[in-house]
């Protein structure tokens, strides 16, 4: 009797086991899905960042008269970046979305900023300022900053690459509040404030 019961138990147990092989998951497919998710996140981040950066730039110029004299600087009003600028965790995806390479590119600019009023557009690449070439790669932004006089109003000659066309612009710097803006995208409740050092959109 024990033999029959034991045999029956083994038979039932064996019948309960999977009778086919488990599916083999493709690592190529999962890597592709991960890349798609990362790209979607980066695009979502940009869709939030760019409008707020445009708004922030306009506010800094429009509110210049409200800032103390010591809290004003001269600027052209362009938010610039290249392939080394984005957060490392989404850098590859940001570079893909914006077409960023070693050259310094206009990511956004305000409508009332000097560059915006002069006709410069997001996507333009900065090649030269006053006949001096802008460095490429990791030193691109510092190369640009060194050529901008923060203390005095000045007319600049800019050489821009737009698509495959090189265009010359003249842009006169204007005063803006010296502090910059920070965009915190981890907060689900919108808020905006300035503390004298930075302006925060969250």
Descriptions of predicted regions:
Residues 3-12:
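Sec-dependent N-terminal signal peptides
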Residues 142-182:
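PDZ-domain C-terminal substructure recognizer with occasional recognition of PDZ-binding tails
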Residues 15-35:
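Bacterial Sec signal peptide processing site at the extreme N-terminus
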Residues 56-67, 119, 130, 148-149, ...:
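Sec/Tat-exported extracytoplasmic proteins
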Residues 180-202:
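Polar-ligand-bearing catalytic/cofactor-coordination segments
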Residues 28-43, 196-199:
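Acidic/histidine-rich, surface-exposed loop or edge segments in extracytoplasmic proteins
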Residues 115-140:
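Conserved PDZ fold ligand-binding element
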Residues 46-104, 170-187:
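PDZ/PDZ-like peptide-tail recognition elements
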């Amino acid at each position: 009797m024990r033999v029959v019961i034991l045999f029956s138990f083994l038979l039932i147990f064996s019948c309960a086991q999977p009778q086919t092989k488990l599916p083999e998951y493709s690592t190529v497919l999962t890597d592709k899905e991960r890349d798609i998710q990362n790209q979607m996140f980066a695009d979502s981040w940009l869709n939030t960042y760019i409008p707020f950066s445009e708004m922030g730039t306009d506010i800094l110029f429009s509110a210049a008269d409200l800032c103390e004299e010591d809290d004003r600087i001269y600027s052209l009003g362009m938010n610039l970046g290249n392939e080394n600028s984005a957060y490392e965790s989404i850098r590859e995806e940001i570079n893909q979305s914006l077409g960023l390479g070693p050259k310094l590119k206009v990511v956004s600019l305000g409508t009332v900023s000097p560059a915006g009023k002069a006709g410069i557009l997001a996507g333009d690449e900065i090649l030269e300022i006053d006949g001096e070439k802008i460095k490429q790669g990791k030193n691109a932004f510092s190369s640009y900053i060194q050529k901008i006089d923060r203390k005095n109003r000045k007319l600049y000659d800019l050489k821009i690459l737009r698509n495959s066309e090189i265009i010359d612009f003249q842009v006169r710097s204007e005063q803006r509040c010296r502090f910059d803006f920070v965009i915190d995208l981890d907060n689900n409740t919108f808020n905006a404030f300035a503390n004298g050092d930075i302006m925060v959109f969250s």
